[in-house]
Structures are given as C-alpha cells and as structure tokens.
Amino acid sequence: MAFKDNAVELEERVVAINRVTKVVKGGRRLRFAALVVVGDGNGRVGFGTGKAQEVPEAIRKAVEAAKKNMIEVPMVGTTIPHEVYTNFGGAKVLLKPAVEGSGVAAGGAVRAVIELAGVADITSKSLGSNTPINIVRATVEGLKQLKRAEEVAALRGISVSDLA
C-alpha cells in the first residue's frame, strides 16, 4: 500500500524531551521521552511521543508516531473558521480567529502545533496546566472540533447564507 506522506514534505518540531527513570534492583534505568509535532504547513498536523534510551532514537519514534496521527485543519483564508475552547487533563486551550496580518499569538506548545498546521493568523490562550503533552493534546482536540460554515449549514439543514 502506497502512502502519500512520502511525497509531501513534513516539517517536524521537538516540543519536549524528558529524562525518565525507572528504579530497579541494581539502580536507576535512564530513558528519554520525546514529544514531537509534525505538519505540512498546509492544513495537516499531527503529534507523537517516543521513548528510548537515546534522545535521537526517541525523537525518531515520536516522528513516526506523529505521521500516523495526522489530522486535517479546516481554514478560512489564513485563520480558523471560529473560536474553540478545549481541555485535556488539567490543560485548557482557547483558540480564536484573528484578522489577516496579525500573526500567531500563541506560546510554546500551542505555537508549534498552530505554525506546523499552517495557520498564519490566530490568537490563543493557554489556561490551567502548562504540561506540554496536555497542551498539545488540547490544541489538537480543538483543531479537530473546527467546522467550516458549509459543514455547519449542512448539519443544520439550512443554506450557508441563512447561517449568519
């Protein structure tokens, strides 16, 4: 089975690398956990985690997981269609559309997801926990909830012009 992902150039960004230890009888076992976001900058983005004894191997595993976990982001011009508020664990993320030219007003993990998704104009606010994995999961969940005006109109059984 052929994958289209190979033809599309995906950009990857390492959001977090954690050193994790497992205490065993002989001492501590060190491993590294990596959180990576990948995207094509054109409406597709995904995230993944990987764990290994070496950092590069953990990053490679995370990139592979992220490529299998891609989502489509509906966009209106250079921004998102509507405001969305999501939470995952203790992390809460608010994403708001912004006028063209205002840029990406987002911090840390939210910025990584938004930029790799290809959204050029957006305002966001992270509330609650600032744990990178939960922030990324909340952001991706918010992007999954976005719907275009045509989709909303079809769900309601009305025309797009009646929507406003």
UniProtKB/Swiss-Prot annotation:
Q: Which UniProt keywords apply?
A: Ribonucleoprotein, Ribosomal protein, RNA-binding, rRNA-binding
The keyword Ribosomal protein is annotated on this UniProt entry: yes
Q: What does this protein do?
A: With S4 and S12 plays an important role in translational accuracy.
InterPro entries, per the entry: Ribosomal_Su5_D2-typ_SF, Ribosomal_uS5, Ribosomal_uS5_bac-type, Ribosomal_uS5_C, Ribosomal_uS5_N, Ribosomal_uS5_N_CS, Ribsml_uS5_D2-typ_fold_subgr
One Gene Ontology BP term is: translation
According to the UniProt entry, the note on domains is: The N-terminal domain interacts with the head of the 30S subunit; the C-terminal domain interacts with the body and contacts protein S4. The interaction surface between S4 and S5 is involved in control of translational fidelity.
Q: Oligomeric state and partners?
A: Part of the 30S ribosomal subunit. Contacts proteins S4 and S8.
GO MF terms, alphabetically ordered: rRNA binding; structural constituent of ribosome
According to its UniProt record, which protein family does this protein belong to?
Belongs to the universal ribosomal protein uS5 family.
UniProt-listed Pfam families: Ribosomal_S5, Ribosomal_S5_C
- Could you name the Gene Ontology cellular component terms for this entry? small ribosomal subunit
User: What domain of life does the native source organism fall in?
Assistant: Bacteria
HAMAP family, alphabetized: Ribosomal_uS5_B (MF_01307_B)
The S5 DRBM domain covers: 10-73
SUPFAM superfamilies cross-referenced by the UniProt entry: dsRNA-binding domain-like, Ribosomal protein S5 domain 2-like
The name on file for this protein is Small ribosomal subunit protein uS5
